[in-house]
């Protein structure tokens, strides 16, 4: 990453500590991104989004008690339409729960396929086209 560009702050949301650790390792290996926060619940994800203003949210669909990742994404993107939220789960894309395609998420990735290349590809698709005028 060039010194003149700030890292994109990442919020990791998952109720399973082992996956949060794995996601932190993936993001550490992804140039241009830095984990700035973690949440175990959908409610805490919404709160932390407001506090930290991350550039990217990695959101598990199935969270413990309270609101799930789809509802948390809906709340974040309703208040911040430019937010970039990537839904993560063990579901196959064809088996995603109702609302996953309309909650405002930038995309969906199966946890088994999650890695630096996937994050970079999503980021480029979402942001390079929107910021190409200079």
Predicted regions and their residues:
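Acidic, metal-coordinating helix/loop segments flanking the phosphotransfer/catalytic sites
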Residues: 38-56
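Short amphipathic alpha-helix used as the core "switch/output" element in two-component signaling
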Residues: 47, 67-81
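The short loop immediately C-terminal to the conserved phospho-acceptor aspartate in CheY-like receiver
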Residues: 55, 62-64
């Amino acid at each position: 990453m060039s010194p003149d560009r700030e890292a994109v702050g990442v919020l990791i949301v998952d109720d399973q500590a082992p996956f949060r650790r794995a996601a932190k390792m993936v993001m550490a290996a992804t140039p241009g991104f830095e984990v700035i926060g973690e949440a175990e619940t959908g409610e805490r994800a919404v709160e932390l989004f407001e506090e930290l203003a991350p550039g990217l949210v990695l959101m598990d669909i199935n969270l413990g008690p309270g609101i799930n990742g789809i509802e948390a994404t809906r709340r974040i993107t309703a208040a911040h339409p430019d937010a970039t939220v990537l839904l993560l789960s063990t579901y196959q894309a064809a088996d995603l729960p109702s609302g996953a395609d309309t909650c405002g998420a930038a995309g969906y990735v199966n946890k088994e396929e999650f890695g630096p290349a996937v994050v970079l590809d999503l980021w480029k698709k979402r942001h390079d086209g929107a910021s190409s005028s200079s």
